[in-house]
């Protein structure tokens, strides 16, 4: 049924030789390429994670700076509004003082003119009274 001749050892030797050749020519270079590719992927992933961490740190820093800048701008705006309010209040107070001073000056001038008018009229009252009496009674009776 089975013949044991040199065919079986030759076939075994061919199989071993083929395995050694395939290992040297195909499997080792292929596993080397796969290992290099896996290492490249690990390095790239590690670099990407580092870049992501740096980017997130920069984003946090910029957000902090932006928040600080917003706070400063709000403080500057509040300060400017307070200054404007103070300046407006000072101007209103100055205008009120000026209006009061003008009012008092006009009132004093009116009072002075009133006094002058009364003095002028007092002088004329005597003269007019005399003229009225002369017209009513006649010039001979009034003296």
UniProtKB/Swiss-Prot annotation:
Gene Ontology CC entries for this record: plasma membrane-derived thylakoid membrane; proton-transporting ATP synthase complex
InterPro entries noted in UniProt: ATP_synth_b, ATP_synth_b/b'su_bac/chlpt, ATP_synthase_B_chain
Subcellular localization, as worded in the UniProt entry: Cellular thylakoid membrane
Transmembrane annotation, as ranges: 6-26
Bilayer topology: Single-pass membrane protein
Keywords for the protein's UniProt record, in alphabetical order: ATP synthesis, CF(0), Hydrogen ion transport, Ion transport, Membrane, Thylakoid, Transmembrane, Transmembrane helix, Transport
Keyword Thylakoid: yes
GO terms of molecular function: proton-transporting ATP synthase activity, rotational mechanism; proton-transporting ATPase activity, rotational mechanism
Keyword Transmembrane helix among record annotations: yes
Domain of life: Bacteria
Annotated signal peptide: none
HAMAP family: ATP_synth_b_bprime, ATP_synth_bprime
Subunit-level organization: F-type ATPases have 2 components, F(1) - the catalytic core - and F(0) - the membrane proton channel. F(1) has five subunits: alpha(3), beta(3), gamma(1), delta(1), epsilon(1). F(0) has four main subunits: a(1), b(1), b'(1) and c(10-14). The alpha and beta chains form an alternating ring which encloses part of the gamma chain. F(1) is attached to F(0) by a central stalk formed by the gamma and epsilon chains, while a peripheral stalk is formed by the delta, b and b' chains.
Task of the protein: F(1)F(0) ATP synthase produces ATP from ADP in the presence of a proton or sodium gradient. F-type ATPases consist of two structural domains, F(1) containing the extramembraneous catalytic core and F(0) containing the membrane proton channel, linked together by a central stalk and a peripheral stalk. During catalysis, ATP synthesis in the catalytic domain of F(1) is coupled via a rotary mechanism of the central stalk subunits to proton translocation.
Family: Belongs to the ATPase B chain family.
Annotated protein name in UniProt: ATP synthase subunit b'
Source species: Microcystis aeruginosa (strain NIES-843 / IAM M-2473)
């Amino acid at each position: 049924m089975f013949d044991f001749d040199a065919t079986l050892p030759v076939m075994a030797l061919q199989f071993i030789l083929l395995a050694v050749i395939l290992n040297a020519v195909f499997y080792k270079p292929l596993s080397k390429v796969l290992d290099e590719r896996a290492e490249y992927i690990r390095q790239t992933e590690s670099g990407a994670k580092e870049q992501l961490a740096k980017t997130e740190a920069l984003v946090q820093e910029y957000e902090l700076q932006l928040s600080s800048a917003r706070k400063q701008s709000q403080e500057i705006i509040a300060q400017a509004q307070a200054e404007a309010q103070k300046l407006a209040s000072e101007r209103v107070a100055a205008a009120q003082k000026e209006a009061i001073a003008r009012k008092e000056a006009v009132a004093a001038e009116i009072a002075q003119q009133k006094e002058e008018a009364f003095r002028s009229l007092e002088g004329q009252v005597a003269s007019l009274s005399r003229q009225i009496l002369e017209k009513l009674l006649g010039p001979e009776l009034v003296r």
